[in-house]
């Protein structure tokens, strides 16, 4: 699973996900992509589940890119712990995804196969997504 090799600080504030994504909202590497339609935290496990699905389809001559990276630590406290005594320890990592962000890209496969792969990968995500192609973006 994806996680940073080292970070400057062990714990982070939760933050908020206002507005739309201004970075990472265009197709850069492949011809087909999966785009987020709502903001959410996507865990490293969910990213990995989507990657496995797409990799299975792209294996036959295709290439895929993961455009998000889980760099935010989420802390949790042990079960049945009283309030107070500081913040919990980091348990897992998430990627902060805003509306419009590209999650995955794929190239080297037919549009039909790419759409099938992205549809299954979309079911692994906790948000609504849409399948987009490079031609859709350039034509309008």
UniProtKB/Swiss-Prot annotation:
Primary location group: plastid
Residues spanning the membrane: none
Record keywords: Chloroplast, Plastid, Ribonucleoprotein, Ribosomal protein
GO cellular component terms, A-Z: chloroplast; mitochondrial large ribosomal subunit
Any Pfam family hit: Ribosomal_L16
GO molecular function, one term: rRNA binding
Any single biological process term in GO: mitochondrial translation
Keyword Repeat on entry: no
Quaternary structure, from the entry: Part of the 50S ribosomal subunit.
Name of this chain's protein: Large ribosomal subunit protein uL16c
Organism: Psilotum nudum
